[in-house]
Amino acid sequence: AMLATGAACGTSDDSDASASKSSSKSSELTGYDVSGVKKDDAIAKMLPDYVTKDGKLTIGMDTSYAPAEFLAADGKTPVGFDVDIAKALAGVFGLEADPETANFDSIIPAVGAKYDIGISSFTVTKERLEAVDFVSHFNAGSAWAVKKGNPNKVDTSDLCGKKVAVQTATMQETAANKMAKQCKADGKAEMDVISSKLQTDVTTNVVTGKADVFYADSPVAGYAIAQTDGELETLGKTEGIAPEGIVVKKGDQQMDEALQKALQKLIDDGTYMKILKYWGVQDGAISKPEINTPGTNE
């Protein structure tokens, strides 16, 4: 969950993260095969002309955020559960999916012009809803991860004296810095916040013992843990769960409703859950996509 108007989840606007230094294991994944998704003529007819005229569904995404959207081993092909959902939606619309890599904070302003939609782990917030529409498609929160067995006896209710790894420019970094200040104010042992641009480095810091615990978006944490082959485990429950959504041009009711119907179809026929299970993020599944509905903790 990212800060500012640009970011939700995802990294900062630093594009070197887009060079995706994902582990060799993660880069082997090519995505769930959605080629069997059939066009639904009734839903396709709901689309506005600007979307259908070139036969493509153009999607803006910051491909530096495994497992939602990142680059495959070739360094060019976008993969991830958001990518697969976008491809499946394009299938329902009878369009060709055209995912394009973009800096995170450039996506929202370009939806409706350069891109038909944006899918990039955007948390649905009241602030963002002033600029664009959203169709919710996933739920994410924040999660903690430690070495298996929690050898350093990390207690997330008191992290004073611990080393906490986070990704730069995330809401988790802000939260960790706030906790560190509180430790100091209370005269307790110092909490060390170790911030890295890439989540892969955040994970490595805990694996190697440089940090005691990391704090990240729940799907990112779950995926990162899976890549360590059992070296790490989650600590406690997912916190602060909020909806993520597909970005649509402000006030484009036709597109909002077409996406809502198409996504509901993919949920009802099981395609949506198969995609999430492929990436190990089924805990974030929703049953009903909603238009312009921010999280309750907003």
Briefly describe each language-model feature range.
Residues F122-L129, N177-K178, V207-G240:
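A ligand-binding cleft/hinge motif common to bilobed small-molecule-binding domains
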Residues G10, K25-D41, G91, N150, ...:
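Extended ligand-binding regions for polar small-molecule ligands
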Residues P78-G91, F122-V124, A140-L198, V213, ...:
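Bilobed "Venus flytrap"/periplasmic-binding protein-like clamshell domains
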Residues T5-K21:
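Bacterial lipoprotein signal-peptidase II cleavage site
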Residues E96-D158:
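Acidic, polar ligand-binding/catalytic clefts
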Residues K25-G118:
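Extracytoplasmic small-molecule ligand-binding "clamshell" domains
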Residues F138-V146, A226-Q264, Q282-E298:
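Periplasmic-binding protein-like
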Residues T30-D49, T174-V193, Q264-E298:
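Ligand-binding clefts/hinges and TM-proximal coupling segments of bilobed small-molecule sensing domains
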